[in-house]
């Protein structure tokens, strides 16, 4: 049995083994974002946040999906083998940070909530400031 722990402060996540109470080394999500992608640079003590997480199993693989608040994105990792976490993909959520019309005049907050159906590949991201929802479907769900 495992648990997924996301750390908003340093922008990382870990897998906790609930039988041995040991955790994997932290994975910093910002390191897997494409060049030029929006990251949180407001403070040196705060990184791009894996805000909300969901876990989905498909064909013997376990995937961790996380909403990245300041990056307006959903990022996916294959965590089937907790000792060998593999970056899978990242997709933009909402209208995009460069076009965010946040009432506060700041575009630093995007994808806040996340919901994933456990079997059909549908994922929803609640985009906080713009008041929208993005629907994703996994490639395997469209096959």
Predicted regions and their residues:
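Short loop/turn segments immediately following beta-strands, especially the blade-tip
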Residues: 16-27, 76-88, 136-143
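Signature of short aromatic-glycine-proline-rich micro-motifs recurring in repeat-based ectodomains
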Residues: 1, 33-55, 102-121
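Extended hydrophobic/aromatic segments used for targeting, binding, or gating
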Residues: 75-118
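Blade-level signature of beta-propeller repeat domains, shared across WD40, Kelch, NHL, RCC1
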Residues: 110-143
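Hard-cation-handling environments
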Residues: 1-3, 8-19, 24, 56
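Structural signal for beta-propeller blades
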Residues: 11-13, 72-74, 131-133
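Short loop/turn segments immediately following the C-termini of beta-strands
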Residues: 8-9, 67-69, 128-129
